[in-house]
Design a protein with these regions (language model features):
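Conserved ABC ATPase "signature" region
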Residues: 45, 59-77
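Conserved ABC ATPase signature
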Residues: 56, 81-85, 89
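Conserved catalytic motifs of ABC-family nucleotide-binding domains
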Residues: 102
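Catalytic Walker B motif of ABC-type/P-loop ATPase nucleotide-binding domains
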Residues: 106-110
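A short, surface-exposed alpha-helical micro-motif characterized by mixed small hydrophobic
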Residues: 147-149
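ABC ATPase nucleotide-binding domains
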Residues: 178-205
Length: 205
């Protein structure tokens, strides 16, 4: 997981030039939009482009597309035009497009943007499930609480540079959070042993 510092603290761009690159890396860009009045399922089908061997969709393509729609909970509006969907619905369709490509690695830039709290948790569990199936996931998040709960590895950016990287416990220390975010915070485990972050307030910097 890649965790930026304060807003505007630095980001990254991944460009895949090789036509077969989509088999290796699937990218979900922040603020990605579509102005085409195509259906959601047609947009998800675009994710199969790296696997296409001819015209039309193969049986394997259709299985992958259906699985991506189910995983993202977008089946119910798969036949609606993308331009008619809400921001949260479009965000889930765009993730479905990535999943349909069955990449080995997923780069998700702000995958929680425009999602309600419940769907944010669903998205994070979805990404964790991908890891459980042997995929690699790099996600850019600003919400520290989500990073604490779901990250295996954290890269903390500050002023466009790597400030610290490693496990959640090693990176999201009180001193690091104070230096980067200007907050008084500490990690702890709740009664069930789940890591949590307590933010007490701001610190003077």
């Amino acid at each position: 997981l890649l965790l930026p510092g304060r807003s505007g603290g630095g980001g990254g761009v991944v460009v895949v030039a090789d036509g077969a690159g989509g088999k290796v890396l699937g990218v979900r860009r922040q603020g990605a939009r579509t102005h085409w009045a195509i259906t959601a399922i047609a947009l998800v089908a675009v994710g199969r482009y790296p696997h296409r061997k001819g015209f039309g969709l193969s049986a394997e393509d259709r299985v992958a597309i259906d699985a991506a729609l189910v995983a993202t909970g977008t089946t119910s509006f798969a036949d609606r035009r993308v331009t008619e969907l809400s921001g949260g619905e479009r965000a889930r369709v765009l993730m479905a497009r990535v999943l349909a490509g069955e990449p080995q690695w997923i780069l998700a830039d702000e995958p929680l943007a425009n999602l309600d709290p419940g769907y944010q948790i669903d998205m994070l569990h979805l990404l964790r499930d991908q890891v459980g199936h042997g995929k690699g996931v790099v996600a850019v998040l600003h919400d520290l609480h989500h990073a604490v709960r779901f990250a295996d590895h954290v890269v903390l950016l500050h002023q466009g540079k790597v400030f610290a990287q490693g496990s959640v416990a090693d990176v999201l220390t009180s001193s690091n959070l104070s230096a980067v975010y200007g907050i008084d915070a500490k990690l702890f485990s709740d009664e069930e042993g789940t890591p949590q972050l307590l933010i007490k307030g701001k610190t003077a910097r």
